[in-house]
């Protein structure tokens, strides 16, 4: 098992990347948050980047350089056949500094609001950019926060692959789908109610969020090294998840992490 060293935070400009990435669905009512327009409904769902300045262009992402990578390779035998199992894992260190240092607030009349993280995950595809056309992957979602240590999301890439194939006439294998992913861009806002005011932590000003890119670069290197393009590869597991840790009163962000894992199996 090989582990990478933790590195300083780096940023990436994605002007060029945005041109070939899958577009986020936009709803043209409400506030503007990190380039996403979200309606304000009876139960307030705080959109991304409430502190966005209309003249401020958010084109930078925090990269996944502060991440520990590992690759496990094992050989197993099943039914008189020999298989190789490869597991690629990345676990980020605490990246809570991708969020604003202090909370902003606005007065709101609603009292039924729940503490929550509003987030989006945008998948950038290398070649077939129409792959995600009919899926809901890029839509903004909300996770209710009820305790100080909680999972924000777990994106099952195998489940997403099933959704893609169910709506497409041109079927694609799980492995081809994963090897076609260039990066995943995440944006999020954490918000809570206190004294009838809505407080929120947004991605830092000028940043669109966090980009998972190094993992897929390493994945691509491993594919080439093992010559997997010419093999019948079975995907056993593939997901990306994120967790948040808060103080007891749920008013301060102590920790944010991102984990990514892909396990492949093929006959040798």
Curated annotation (Swiss-Prot):
Superkingdom assignment: Bacteria
The protein's name is Uncharacterized protein MHO_3790
Q: Recall the taxonomic lineage recorded for the source organism.
A: Bacteria, Bacillati, Mycoplasmatota, Mycoplasmoidales, Metamycoplasmataceae
